[in-house]
C-alpha cells in the first residue's frame, strides 16, 4: 500500500514539473511575439519558397537572415512551421538550427505548434528530429490536444513510440481530461494500449465524465481491447460520474461480444445510472437487437420496475420496431405506464410507449404496439389528438381502427363542449372526414345555448353509445363550437366546415350566431337547401344503424365484415363515399 502511494506521489511530482515547464514556455510566447503584423520581407518570401520547393542550397543562403525566420504570414506560420510539414528532413534541420529556440514552441493562428503540425502531417522522422533537438513533447495545441493524442488519432504506432522514447507524459489530460489511453481505447488499438501500459500508462484514468478507458472500449465495441484492459487491471465495476456502468456503455455500443465478455467477468444488468436507466433501456433505445437478446435474461423485473420505465418505452422512443417485437415476444407489457416522476418531466405528461411512437410519427412502431394490444386511450393527451395535430393520416387511421376514442377531450386544458380532435382538422378535409367517418359526435358541434332565430335553445339528449374501456365520459361544457369557429381569424372556414358536418347529421339546428356568419358565405345556398329539406330515408337508416352498432364495432373491420349485408351496404354504413383518405 505504501509502495503504491510513493509511486503515485512521484508521478504527481513529475507531472507538476512538466506542467511548470509548459506554463513557462507559454508565458514566454506571450511576452516574445515577433513581427507578425509587419509586412513580410523579400528574404522571408524567398526563404519560405525555398522550403516549399525543397531547394536546400538556396535555403542555406536565406537562413542567414535571422529576421526572415522571425516573420509570420497571415496564418501565423513562421518558416519553421513550413519546414516541419515538408518531407525532406534536411530542410527541417537547417531551419531548426537557424531559428531561435523561443520559436520552437510558437503557435500558428490555428493554435498548432511545430511538433503538433509534424505529427498531424504524419512525418515520423520530422517528429524525431524535433524531439532530438530538444523540442518539448507535451505542449498542447489550442484544441487541448497533446502530440501523443494526435499521434494516436492518426493511428501511427511509430510516432507514438517515438514520443514515448522522448519522455512524453502518458497520462497528461487533454480537453475534458481525455487521455492518450482513452483515445487508444476509442480507436481500438490494442498494440498502442500495450505500448502505453508497458511504459506505466494508467488503466484507471477517468475523463471529464468519469469514464475509464475500459468504458470507452466498451462503448466503441472493441472486444479485444476490452479484454486486454480487463486482464491489465481494468475495473469492470467502475461507474462514470452519471452512474453509468461499463456494461451500460457497452449496451450503447451494441457489440454483443462486449456484453457477453463483461457479463462473464461479473458485470450486472441491474445497475442503473443516476437517471435510473439500465443497460437494457440503452440497448433498446439505440436499437441494438443482439445486445438486447443478451440483456433480457440478465435484467430483473424488479430492477426494471424500480427504474420507472420499461424497455418497451425506450424502444418506442428510439423508433426501433425490431427491438419492440423482441421485447413483446419476451413478455414485456405494451401498456406499462411511466412512473409519475418521469411522466411529469414531459410537458404533455405522456405515460405509454404508444405515445412515444405516435409523437415520433413512427407508423411501424405504432402498428407493432397496437397489434400487440396497446391501449390508445391511456395518456392524459390522447394519442389520437397528437396524430391529428401532426396531420398523420395513416397513424390516425390505425389508432381509430384499434379503438382510439375519436370523441376524447384533453382534460388538462379543455374548455369546449365538443370533442377536441376537430380543432386540429379544420384546414384538412381528409382528416376531418376521417374523424367524422369513424364516429365523431358531430351533433355536439351544434350544442349551444344561443338559441335559434326564434329564441329556442337546443338541448341534446345523452348519447346512446356506451363508453369504451379507458374512455373518459367527462365533458366540460364551456365554449360551444359556434363561439370557437366564428372568431375573426377563422370566420372564413365556417361555410366549408358546416357543409361537411351536415353530411353526418339528420337534423341540423343552426343557432342565430352561426347562421348570421353562414349567410354571407358562398356555401350558404347549398347548406340552406340541405337543411330545409328532409333527409333521405337511406341516410336516416344509416345513422340509426351506426348508433345501434356503437363505435367499438364500427371501427373494427372484422366486425363490419361479419354483418349479413351486401358489400355496397357495408360501404354505405361506413361513409365510404366520403372517405377521401381511402380513395
Curated annotation (Swiss-Prot):
- Matches recorded under InterPro entries: Ankyrin_rpt, Ankyrin_rpt-contain_sf, SOCS_box, SOCS_box-like_dom_sf
TM region(s), chain numbering: none
Q: Which residues form the SOCS box domain?
A: 524-579
Residues of the signal peptide: none
Q: What pathway does the UniProt record associate with this protein?
A: Protein modification; protein ubiquitination
Q: Does the keyword Repeat apply?
A: yes
Extract the coiled-coil ranges from the record: none
Question: What does the sequence similarity comment in the record state about its family?
Answer: Belongs to the ankyrin SOCS box (ASB) family.
- Domain note: The SOCS box domain mediates the interaction with the Elongin BC complex, an adapter module in different E3 ubiquitin-protein ligase complexes.
Described purpose of this protein according to its UniProt entry: May be a substrate-recognition component of a SCF-like ECS (Elongin-Cullin-SOCS-box protein) E3 ubiquitin-protein ligase complex which mediates the ubiquitination and subsequent proteasomal degradation of target proteins.
What's this protein's name? Ankyrin repeat and SOCS box protein 15
The record lists the organism as Mus musculus
Amino acid at each position: 500500500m505504501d509502495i503504491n502511494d510513493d509511486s503515485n506521489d512521484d508521478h504527481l511530482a513529475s507531472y507538476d514539473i512538466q506542467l511548470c515547464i509548459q506554463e513557462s514556455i507559454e508565458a514566454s510566447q506571450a511576452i516574445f511575439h515577433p513581427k507578425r503584423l509587419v509586412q513580410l520581407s523579400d528574404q522571408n518570401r524567398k526563404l519560405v519558397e525555398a522550403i516549399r520547393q525543397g531547394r536546400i542550397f538556396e535555403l542555406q543562403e536565406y537562413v542567414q537572415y535571422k529576421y526572415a525566420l522571425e516573420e509570420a504570414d497571415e496564418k501565423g506560420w513562421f518558416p519553421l512551421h513550413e519546414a516541419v510539414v515538408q518531407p525532406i528532413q534536411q530542410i527541417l534541420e537547417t531551419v531548426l538550427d537557424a531559428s531561435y529556440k523561443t520559436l520552437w514552441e510558437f503557435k500558428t493562428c490555428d493554435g498548432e505548434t511545430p511538433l503538433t503540425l509534424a505529427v498531424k502531417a504524419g512525418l515520423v522522422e520530422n517528429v524525431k528530429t524535433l524531439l532530438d533537438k530538444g523540442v518539448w513533447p507535451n505542449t498542447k495545441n489550442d484544441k487541448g490536444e497533446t502530440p501523443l493524442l494526435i499521434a494516436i488519432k492518426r493511428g501511427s504506432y511509430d510516432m507514438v513510440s517515438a514520443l514515448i522514447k522522448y519522455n512524453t507524459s502518458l497520462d497528461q489530460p487533454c480537453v475534458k481530461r481525455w487521455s492518450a489511453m482513452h483515445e487508444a481505447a476509442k480507436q481500438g488499438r490494442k498494440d498502442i494500449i500495450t505500448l502505453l501500459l508497458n511504459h506505466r500508462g494508467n488503466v484507471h484514468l477517468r475523463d471529464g465524465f468519469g469514464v475509464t478507458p475500459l468504458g470507452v472500449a466498451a462503448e466503441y465495441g472493441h472486444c479485444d481491447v476490452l479484454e486486454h484492459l480487463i486482464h491489465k487491471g481494468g475495473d469492470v465495476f467502475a461507474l462514470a460520474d452519471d452512474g453509468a456502468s461499463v456494461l451500460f456503455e457497452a449496451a450503447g455500443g451494441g457489440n454483443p461480444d462486449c456484453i457477453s465478455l463483461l457479463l462473464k467477468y461479473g458485470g450486472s444488468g441491474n445497475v442503473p445510472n443516476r437517471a435510473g436507466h439500465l443497460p437494457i433501456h440503452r440497448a433498446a433505445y439505440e436499437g441494438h437487437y443482439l445486445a438486447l437478446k443478451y440483456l433480457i435474461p440478465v435484467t430483473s423485473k424488479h430492477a426494471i420496475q424500480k427504474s420507472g420505465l420499461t424497455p418497451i418505452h425506450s424502444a418506442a422512443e428510439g423508433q426501433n420496431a425490431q427491438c419492440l417485437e423482441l421485447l413483446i415476444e419476451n413478455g414485456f407489457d405494451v401498456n406499462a405506464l411511466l412512473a409519475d416522476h418521469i411522466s411529469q418531466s414531459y410537458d404533455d405528461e405522456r405515460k405509454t410507449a404508444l405515445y412515444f411512437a405516435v409523437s415520433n410519427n413512427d407508423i411501424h412502431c405504432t402498428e407493432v404496439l397496437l397489434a400487440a394490444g396497446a391501449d390508445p386511450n391511456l395518456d392524459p393527451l390522447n394519442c389520437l389528438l397528437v396524430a391529428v395535430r401532426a396531420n398523420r393520416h395513416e397513424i390516425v387511421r390505425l389508432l381509430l381502427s384499434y379503438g382510439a376514442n375519436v370523441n376524447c377531450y384533453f382534460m388538462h386544458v379543455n374548455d369546449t363542449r365538443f370533442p377536441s380532435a376537430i380543432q386540429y382538422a379544420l384546414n384538412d378535409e381528409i382528416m376531418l372526414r376521417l374523424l367524422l367517418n369513424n364516429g365523431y359526435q358531430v351533433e355536439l358541434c351544434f350544442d349551444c345555448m344561443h338559441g335559434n332565430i326564434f329564441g329556442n335553445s337546443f338541448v341534446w339528449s345523452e348519447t346512446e353509445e356506451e363508453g369504451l374501456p379507458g374512455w373518459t365520459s367527462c365533458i366540460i361544457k364551456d365554449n360551444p363550437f359556434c363561439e370557437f369557429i366564428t372568431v375573426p381569424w377563422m370566420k372564413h372556414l365556417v361555410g366549408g366546415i358546416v357543409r361537411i358536418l351536415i353530411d353526418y347529421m339528420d337534423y341540423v339546428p343552426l343557432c342565430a350566431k352561426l347562421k348570421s356568419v353562414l349567410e354571407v358565405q358562398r356555401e350558404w345556398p347549398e347548406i340552406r337547401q340541405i337543411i330545409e329539406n328532409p333527409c333521405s330515408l337511406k341516410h336516416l337508416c344509416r345513422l340509426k344503424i351506426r348508433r345501434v352498432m356503437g363505435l367499438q364495432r364500427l371501427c373494427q373491420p372484422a366486425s363490419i365484415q361479419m354483418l349479413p349485408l351486401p358489400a355496397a351496404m357495408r360501404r354505405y354504413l361506413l361513409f365510404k363515399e366520403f372517405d377521401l383518405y381511402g380513395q
